[in-house]
Amino acid sequence: MGIIRKIISVIIFALLASALWTASAKDVTVSGSSTVMPLAEAAAEEFNLLQKDYMVSVSAGGTGAGILGIAERKNDIAMASREITDEELQRFGNSFQQYLVCLDGISIAVSDEIYQAGVTELDKQQVHDIYSGNITNWKEVGGPDADIYVISREEGSGTRDEFNEIIMGNRSAETPGVDTVAMGAAEVKTAISGSDKAIGYLGFNYLGGAVMGIAFNGIKPNYENIKLDLYELHRHLYFYTYGKPSEGSQAFIDFVQGPEGQKIASEEGFIPI
């Protein structure tokens, strides 16, 4: 019985210690871009294991929602796949603090069947015409005789904003050729891999499996081309705070920008800064 009591005492002590640590740790909430989320989640997991002063939690919702969240003091850090817009500055003021966390590229991706049928490259005008609804069949761009299933991102997505700016001419451009709107990069990947005739756009780190990244204006979306700014759809990914960050927020930002965080960025398929 004495041994059993000791075992029970050890278990209870461990549970209480864990509860006390959780209660005493200061929360740091991170929200926003689904593109940046794999880096933030993996970094938060490691950061939470390495220290006991702060507990970082991460959730998606899109760049726009993340920026709104910090401006309204609902979250501490916003993940963003674009820079703050003039509209956001006018609405919330110029108190945003920007932190570069990694590099990425918006990849134009197609279903494996389309890639294998010969569509391994599109130029800017072709992508524009597909999303405008002017090109509706893959045979018009050297592919098979099949309707093009066009996937876009939801309103508020930083990736959508950047894509529209570069391809369509402005962030709020209409895209009448779109068949479905995906809520996040992972959903884009699922939609493309589940179709034999799809096209979509998503972060470089989401390519793989049946989701094939194609060359854009003759340049492939790979590590070297993005790092050297040769790929036109390259971009910077950010954390933002609204005003001076809290000690916990600053500690997490420093971790992500430091050697350990940048190693995680590379492991998650991003290009380190």
Model segments located where?
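Positively charged n-region of N-terminal signal peptides that target proteins for export
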Residues: M1-I7
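Bacterial N-terminal signal peptides
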Residues: I8-A19
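Exported/periplasmic ABC-transporter solute-binding proteins
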Residues: W21-F92, F96-I273
